[in-house]
Amino acid sequence: MGIPDDPAGSAPENFDLATMRVEYVEKDGCGDLDVDWLGDDPATGWLTLLQTWINDAWKAGLPDANAMVVGTVDADGRPVTRSVLCKSVDPDGITFYTNYDSAKGEHLAVNAYASATFPWYQLGRQVHVRGAVTKVSAEETAEYWSKRPRGSQLGAWASQQSRPIASRAALLEQLAEVTERFADLDEVPVPPNWGGYRIAPEVVEFWQGRENRVHNRIRVTGGRVERLQP
């Protein structure tokens, strides 16, 4: 599984994307998403609802319940997306950490605006966020860095993220080198080119799948909340 029988051959047997379809039904048992789920103040209610949905996904046993697809735009205006882990959700926004010299870091240096989508397919839910992006403080980065497993810290040092490399063996050799370099240190320092980005939400949209594609969509823009047609 995962490796084609013939990489240069035809598509798998009975491969028909047009007929791949799952009918959405109520999966969460909590009724239809509506504007009142955001409370009296949508400007802050989005945060509580997003935190609740992430926690629901975690309790349901979904893998990487805090994973989100982050979209950036390169210098030529071409969009790029990738999955990353959200590591903080607070009134200021949603935060993720990465190598500042990575492709997304280069994009954000040119266009400091991004989108993020949390997809929880098994629950029939999705949240989309977009807004301006800023780097978090060195102190906040250091606090999160201290919570990462040592192996993950070493991996951050070993990888020149988004840069080509000859083979996996070469990558593991780089990891071995940094492992030896920091072997005598109790704490691995934060790489100078590594840290967090925070997306300050300008728009937050909650999506809930329903039968016949008549889905529920609630959009929050500042203090304004509105239902959108699916």
UniProtKB/Swiss-Prot annotation:
Keywords: Flavoprotein, FMN, Oxidoreductase, Pyridoxine biosynthesis. Substrate binds at residues 21-24, 87, 144, 148, 152, 213-215. It comes from the Bacteria. Binds 1 FMN per subunit. It is an enzyme of class 1 (oxidoreductase). Its cofactor is FMN. PROSITE patterns: PYRIDOX_OXIDASE (PS01064). It catalyses: pyridoxamine 5'-phosphate + O2 + H2O = pyridoxal 5'-phosphate + H2O2 + NH4(+); pyridoxine 5'-phosphate + O2 = pyridoxal 5'-phosphate + H2O2. Catalyzes the oxidation of either pyridoxine 5'-phosphate (PNP) or pyridoxamine 5'-phosphate (PMP) into pyridoxal 5'-phosphate (PLP). Belongs to the pyridoxamine 5'-phosphate oxidase family. This is Pyridoxine/pyridoxamine 5'-phosphate oxidase.
